[in-house]
Amino acid sequence: MGIVQIVNSIFSSNTYILSHTDSCRVWLIDIGDIEPVIARLLPGQQIQGVFLTHTHFDHFYGINQLISLFPDCIVYTSAHGQEGLYSEKLNFSKYHNHPFVFSGNKVKILHEGDRIEIFRGQKLEVLETPGHDPGCLTYFTENYIFTGDSYLFDTKVITSFP
């Protein structure tokens, strides 16, 4: 499996592109800036889905552009995360320059222990890791773990606001 990290323009959040040489399927972990994601796709590759670590706007502000380009793309999140997709207050975009909500409806709710096959014989496993946000999910496969803001090296994670 190949992984490409993109550091996004808002709050330096990350998007990860997961691909495999034996597949045209591509998966994302979070989606911020869409342009660098599209620039890294090879001819014939299709984004199948995006796994959201949580639904604070800096982790999914590129979602509507993504869905317009890949209308069959599925958004994977927690039940609380689904609420954040459709609430500019819960996703905190209301308090920044560009309030928005998700305009699509292809959402799959994930739970602790779910395993989704992303490539032949390779699954992404789901861990519920509430703290920074009640709906935080962590994903792992092989030797990789994607924590979103549940764990930030050398940084205090904010779990509530004054």
Predicted regions and their residues:
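Conserved N-terminal entry element of GNAT/NAT acetyltransferase domains
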Residues: 1-2, 119-123
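Divalent metal-coordination and catalytic microenvironments
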Residues: 18, 30, 54, 66, ...
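Hydrophobic "anchor" residues on beta-strands that sit immediately upstream
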Residues: 26, 50, 74, 128, ...
